[in-house]
Amino acid sequence: MQNGKDDSKMKLKTIICLTLAVILALSCLAGCQGTENPVPASDPPATKEPQGKPEEPVPAVPLSAVINAKALGFSAFDNQLVEYLKQAGRADENFTVSPLSFKAALTMAALGAEGETQAQLLEALGFRSVDEMRAWYATVLAGVDRFDAFFTEMEKEAAELAEYFPDAANSQERTAAYWVVNSVWSNQDLPGEFRQSFLDEIAKTCYAEAYSAKAAELANAVNAWVNEKTNGLIPSILDDASDTSAVLVNALYLKTGWEDGFAKLGDRDFTTRSGEKVQKPFMEQTAHMAYYKDEQTQLVSVPLQGGVSMVFVLGEDTGLADKLSKAEYKLVDVTVPMIDVETTLNQKELVNYLKLLGCEKMFTDTAEFDPMYTDPLCVADIIQKAKVHTDEEGLEAAAVTAIVMNATGVLREPETPEIFCADQPFSFYILKDGASPELLFWGQIVN
C-alpha cells in the first residue's frame, strides 16, 4: 500500500530497478546421459595447427536492420540480439532468450583471447576494455549476492519471530534461488589443455570451475553439470562432443515467488498474432505496482521476491526503460496467461548475430585464443537453451550457453484498478536490480 507520495516514489524506483534485469533467454542442444566424475583440468604443453576454416553461414538479417533496431532500453547488445532473433524468423512464434547468459559465456571467451579476436569481442559486447568487462561481471555477481541477502534476512526475521511465537514458525527450507555459474571443459583425448593463467583469470573474475573428461564422456559430463546447475530444468546442452577440444559453459537459474500471489482463473481465450483464438490457463491478481499506458504501449511491472520483477508489455515494447521511469505506482488488476516457453538457439542464429556485429576472427583458423589454450582453437558453435515457466505461485527460469571450440575449426550444424489483460500477443522481461539493471530473460507469447 502507499504511505504517501514520497514513499510511493521511492518504492516505484525500487520496482523499476528490479524490473530492468530479468530478460534473458536460454537455449540448448539435446542429448545426454549419466557420466563418470569429471577430473580437474591440468596444463601440459602441446601444439597442433587447426585444419581448415569453419563454414561461413550467410546472415539471415542485414546488419542495418539490427543496428537500427528500436532500443528496448537496455544495452545495445541486448537490444540488437532481441531484434535480430525477431527478424531472423521468430517474430511469429513464442520464444525466449537470455542475453545475460550469452554475455557471460562470451566474457570467458574474451578473457582467453588476444589481439583482433579480443578486440572484436569487446566491441560487440559494448566494452571499451577488459577491465570494464570485469567490472560489469562484478555487478552481475553483486546482484546474485543481493538476492541471497534478501532471503537470508527473511530467514533471520522468521527465526527471531519463532522465539516468541513458536507455533507460527515456518520450518520449510528455502526454495527461492538465483545463481550465475560458469565452467570450462577440455577433451583429454585431444592435444592441448587450458593454460593455468587462463584458469586463474576466469576463477577470479567469473568463479568458473575447470574440468576435463575423455572424448566419449565429455558430452555426458557437461550435461550432468548443466542438469545440476539448472535444477533439472535444462537436462542437457550437447549431443556429441567427441571431436570437441574445449567447451565454455554458463548456466543461469532463477526461482522465486510473486510478492502478491496470483489466483488461477482456468482456461480462457488468447488471441494469437494471426487472429486465431486458442485456450490458455490464465491467472489474476489485484495489487499496487508500477503501471504505464500511452497510445502505443501498456505495461505493468509485477514484483517478485528477491529484487526481481517481471514486466508484461502489450503493444510496442520500444524504449522500455524510459517508459518504466514514467510509470506510476497504481492499483492494477493484472490478468495474464501462465507461461511455459522453451527455446533452442545455435550457430545459425548466435554465430550469425556475432558476425553481424563484427566478430569474424574467432570463427576462423586464425582465431587468437593462445592465452586460453595450449593448442590453436577457434569457435565451432555457440548454443543456448532457455526456459521460462510461470504459475500462480511464482517464476522458474534457466538458461545455458555453451561455446564449443575445435582445433579443426569445423562448424556444427477500492481504487478502481487499471486493467491489464494479456489475452493477445505480448512480450515479457525478467529483470534483476542494480545500478545498471541486467536483462535476465526476454520473451514473447504470440500463439
Task: Spell out what each predicted region is.
Residues M1-K9:
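Short, Lys/Arg-enriched N-terminal segments with co-localized hydrophobic residues
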Residues A71, S75, P99, G115, ...:
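Conserved structured core elements
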Residues D92, D131-L314, S325-R412:
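Non-catalytic, conformational "gating/processing" segments within enzyme and secreted inhibitor domains
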Residues T96, A104, S183, M310-V313, ...:
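Structural recognition of the beta-strand scaffold that forms the well-ordered cores
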